Amino acid sequence: MRALAVDLGGSHATCALVEDRTIIRAKTLATEGSVGLGPILPSLAAALCTVMQEAETGASQCAGLAFCFCGLVDHAQAKVISTNAKYDDAPRLDLKGWCEKSLGVPFAIENDARMALLGESYAGAARGFDDVVMVTLGTGIGGVAMIQGRLLRGKHSQAGCLGGHFPVLFDGRQCTCGAIGCAEAEAAGWSLPEVCRTTRGFASSSLAKDPITFERLFGYAEEGDPVPVEVRERRLAVWAALTVGLIHAYDPEVVIFGGGVMKSASMILPYLQSYANRHAWTPWGKVTVRCAELGSRAGLLGAIPLLQGRAAS
């Protein structure tokens, strides 16, 4: 089975042709979330046509287009419900109509975190598990749950996909969503520079010399610089508290962590596993904490199960 897939991020979009558990062809375009989704739809359609041509595949050979979107999505109605400072015109767009007119294939859309979990369940670290929570650590924090082999969506399509907005500190930092002390506000990539700059001793630390990233944070912490060490330990504590909260909320067999931060998985995973073992209330046994396997391919590889309806709520 072949399918088209679009994975839309804040700064780029990947358009691909997938077959079963393999990406046959892919083309990545630069985008700008602040500009909106409408202006780039022609470019997305053109890129999808290009990957089909390169693979000598016609639209009639594709099961449809699976669209991976960075916002709240009503999968059943095939539309975007709400955004957060990226592609804010999306709720007003008829994406299904655009797809049918431009490509002539069926259309399905899902939240990016859910699509990543579908991919990991189909071809990666969640394969063989029916009850899974996945957390993506990057610019933001994505969270999604699968219960008894079915994606958790809820009455308003919000269930399970707002893990980054679990409150972890009642008097913490202001989040972009408007709440206080969300996991994102305390330990996501977008909040990291401010967290570092407001830490005592920052001006004389290694972090003051370069643009602040998680990769540099963990690197300088390994060298023993006290400011990066302090910030790193606080990030780990937030992620660990979030892990336990998600375990208590969704009763998974396994919690999977993905995203660019997991380049430091050899240090992060043992911390999270140890914390979960000590603090999660799971009398039946221990929840496994593991690293995602598919990286940036996860959302694209979620196309086949999404179009087949394998994980419908």
Give residue ranges: language-model regions.
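Short glycine-rich, Thr/Ser-proximal phosphate-binding strand/loop in the N-terminal lobe
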Residues: 2-46, 60, 79-82, 151, ...
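Short glycine-aspartate micro-motif
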Residues: 3-7, 62-66, 132-136, 176, ...
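A mobile "lid/hinge" subdomain adjacent to the ATP/sugar-phosphate binding pocket shared
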Residues: 13, 23, 180-256
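Glycine-rich phosphate-binding/hydrolytic loop that grips phosphoryl groups
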Residues: 18, 110-121, 262-313
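Glycine-rich phosphate-binding loop and adjoining helix at the ATP-binding site
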Residues: 33, 37-45, 61-65, 71-133, ...
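Phosphate/pyrophosphate-binding loops at sites that engage ATP/ADP/AMP, CoA/4′-phosphopantetheine
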Residues: 44-65, 106-107, 125, 202-206, ...
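Glycine-rich phosphate-binding loop of actin/hexokinase-like ATP-binding domains
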Residues: 129-186
